[in-house]
């Protein structure tokens, strides 16, 4: 299974750090965020990855290169301006192919095991989402989860972790080159009962602000 790492975002809330560094290259625990993902993908048996880039994207390409030092073969999907998540995926489909792929937000830190996801069979599902307990800044959550099925009901709700196994069919409605968010497509898949998921309760952190970045650094430092 190929992987796609989403790394095209501007990182407005992390300025001024992201005025000089793309968010995926912000250092955490002694290495850039994206390095954690690349190393874990290779360890999970993934051999090919696509990275979408836009803001300061050449810095990411210079750092990762062709991916060989991470044990991966890496290709780049370049966006003149960010196309949002679904738009970025649709733009990258010629590189991803027609089979399901593992989607990872490169600007989050997540210790979920990639190996079972790389081996996951979607069957008739359009996507399989990794969900996490709601962080303070997203207390309302995104989805419910019951018996492995993702919903939008009134039960316990969880936050989408930015990690998923996804079929290219999910973004079929999106025209290449068009800007499009992912959430409406996920909720449409919920309505069709074609979204599965799992709950991950290990270390996950959205590093969208300096405060969250500092919190993650403290958590990692406490382990050493």
Feature annotation, model-predicted:
Residues 2-5, 27, 31-105, 114-116, ...:
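Conserved N-terminal catalytic core of the sugar/cofactor nucleotidyltransferase
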Residues 55, 128-142:
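Short beta-strand-to-loop element that shapes/binds the nucleotide-sugar donor at the catalytic cleft/hinge
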């Amino acid at each position: 299974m190929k992987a796609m790492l989403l790394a095209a975002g501007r990182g407005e809330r992390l300025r001024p750090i992201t005025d000089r560094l793309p968010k995926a290259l912000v250092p955490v625990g002694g290495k850039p965020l994206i390095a954690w993902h690349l190393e874990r993908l290779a360890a999970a048996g993934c051999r090919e990855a696509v990275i979408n880039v836009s803001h300061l994207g050449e810095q990411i390409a210079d750092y990762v290169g062709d991916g060989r030092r991470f044990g991966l073969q890496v290709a780049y999907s370049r966006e003149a301006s960010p196309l949002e998540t679904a738009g970025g995926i649709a733009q990258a489909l010629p590189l991803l192919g027609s089979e399901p792929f593992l989607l990872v937000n490169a600007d989050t830190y997540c210790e979920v095991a990639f190996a079972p996801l790389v081996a996951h069979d979607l069957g008739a599902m359009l996507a399989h989402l990794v969900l996490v307990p709601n962080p303070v800044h997203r207390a309302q959550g995104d989805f419910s989860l019951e018996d492995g099925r993702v919903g939008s009901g009134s039960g316990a709700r969880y936050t989408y972790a930015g990690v998923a196994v996804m079929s290219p069919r999910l973004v079929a409605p999106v025209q290449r080159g068009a800007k499009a968010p992912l959430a409406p497509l996920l909720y449409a898949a919920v309505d069709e009962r074609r979204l599965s998921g799992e709950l991950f309760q290990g270390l996950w952190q959205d590093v969208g602000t300096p405060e969250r970045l500092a919190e993650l650094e403290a958590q990692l430092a406490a382990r050493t």
